[in-house]
């Protein structure tokens, strides 16, 4: 995403993005990286001599959707977690019609009391162990005997290009009795874990790529943003962003867990949902929003977050990634104290703030990383006890793998998307400048 490589970014616009076909445009890059691996004669100005310069590609920096295009592993559905792979644990919520990624008790010690508590979690006793991160050798083993053809659908003589575009955009309509099943293909057969591999990544042409421990980074910037928006949307009960609701409570009924949160049916047959530990009253929401609206920060510390506050509806909208970064780590733990939420929710928010603070610190203490991993596992398990299953999107689950990536790749400042987004600003400016000059 540097200035010299902006042309590569310009070929991936809009809904007709390259997707898995991006390997076609990455081929020149791979050829150069292979050449650097073998060695390139380079002149040393200090010694006045030539030497063979060698270089290797450590990893890729990308957001989560782009990881699917570079890796080839689909980041949606049952096995959406690229680290867990076939060992991912998830299930489909029938009423909410979405996937739930729980099962974090597997990372707890074998005799921890949470493993035996059915009713407080997903209704099962957890006996499994934490899965190992899927290696490059495992991925290549799953690709054996498979052939993939890159390229878009070519229109036939009877079908124009316009018809193909309309067909690709048109969505299939479901009948009222048809249910979405994330684990079945178009033929109705049960999907296998290896079906989540959509291609053989072009990076495996590099002789060392199979043995790299960390190949594609999980983007801490967007994961932190998604987690923060889950909390804000659920606590403030923002329409379209909250993870709680009638369907979420009906999923608890189907799972047979946490009867105190099940919907209540009155004498007229109307359903209402009881207050949960994370439910806030109108007065509490107003206090929280007023604290954020009246907040004043040092120059350069954060943007004007007060512009995102709507006091009439008690909502927060239009937050940028860095706004969520500051909110989750520094503002939200303090602001929530003023509106007196439940102790369980307050504890979770403080633990998450401390987790991301230590994770994003410039200096990493290796002796503290094991404790940090234990703390995020306990926090995720406490979240499973309090929040509804629909809260646990794949971004929430991926937090359990972030400490391991710090051990392998070092501080997140060298591996997240903030620098890339800043480089992209130049591209957006040039694009709009050219657009305006066309009509002036």
Predicted regions, residues:
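Helix-boundary capping/turn motifs
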Residues: 1-2, 263, 280-284, 293-307, ...
């Amino acid at each position: 995403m540097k200035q010299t490589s902006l042309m590569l970014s310009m070929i991936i616009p809009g809904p007709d993005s390259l997707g898995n076909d991006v390997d076609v445009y990455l081929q020149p890059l791979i050829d150069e990286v292979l050449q650097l691996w073998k060695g390139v004669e380079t002149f040393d100005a200090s010694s006045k001599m030539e030497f063979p310069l060698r270089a290797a590609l450590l990893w890729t920096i990308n957001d989560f959707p782009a990881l699917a295009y570079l890796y080839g592993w689909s980041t949606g559905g049952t096995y959406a977690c690229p680290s867990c792979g076939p060992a991912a644990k998830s299930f489909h919520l029938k009423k909410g019609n979405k996937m739930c990624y729980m099962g974090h008790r597997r990372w707890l010690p074998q005799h921890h009391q949470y493993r035996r508590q059915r009713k407080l979690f997903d209704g099962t006793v957890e006996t499994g162990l934490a899965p190992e991160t899927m290696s490059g050798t495992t991925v290549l083993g799953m690709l054996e005997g498979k052939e993939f053809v890159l390229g878009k659908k070519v229109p036939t003589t009877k079908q124009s290009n316009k018809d193909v575009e309309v067909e690709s955009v048109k969505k299939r309509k479901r009948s009222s009795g048809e249910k979405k099943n994330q684990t079945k293909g178009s033929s109705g057969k049960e999907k296998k874990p290896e079906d989540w591999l959509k291609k053989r990544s072009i990076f495996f042409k590099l002789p060392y790529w199979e043995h790299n421990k960390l190949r594609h980074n999980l983007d801490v910037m967007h994961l932190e943003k998604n987690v923060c928006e889950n909390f804000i949307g659920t606590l403030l009960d923002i329409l379209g962003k909250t993870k709680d609701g009638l369907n979420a409570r009906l999923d608890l009924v189907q799972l047979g867990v946490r009867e105190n949160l099940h919907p209540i049916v009155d004498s007229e047959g109307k359903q209402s949902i009881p207050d949960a530990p994370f439910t806030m009253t109108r007065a509490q929401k107003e206090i929280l929003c007023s604290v954020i609206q009246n907040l004043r920060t040092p120059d350069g510390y954060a943007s004007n977050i007060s512009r995102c506050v709507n006091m009439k509806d008690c909502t927060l909208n239009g937050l940028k990634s860095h706004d969520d970064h500051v909110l989750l780590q520094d503002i939200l733990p303090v602001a929530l104290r003023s509106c007196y939420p439940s102790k369980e929710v307050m504890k979770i928010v403080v633990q998450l703030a401390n987790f991301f603070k230590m994770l994003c610190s410039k200096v990493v203490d290796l002796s503290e990383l094991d404790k940090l991993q234990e703390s995020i596992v306990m926090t995720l398990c406490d979240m499973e006890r309090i929040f509804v299953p629909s809260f646990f999107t794949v971004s929430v689950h991926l937090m359990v793998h972030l400490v391991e990536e710090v051990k392998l790749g070092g501080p997140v400042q060298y591996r997240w998307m903030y620098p890339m987004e800043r480089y992209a600003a130049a591209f957006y400016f040039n694009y709009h400048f050219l657009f305006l000059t066309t009509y002036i």
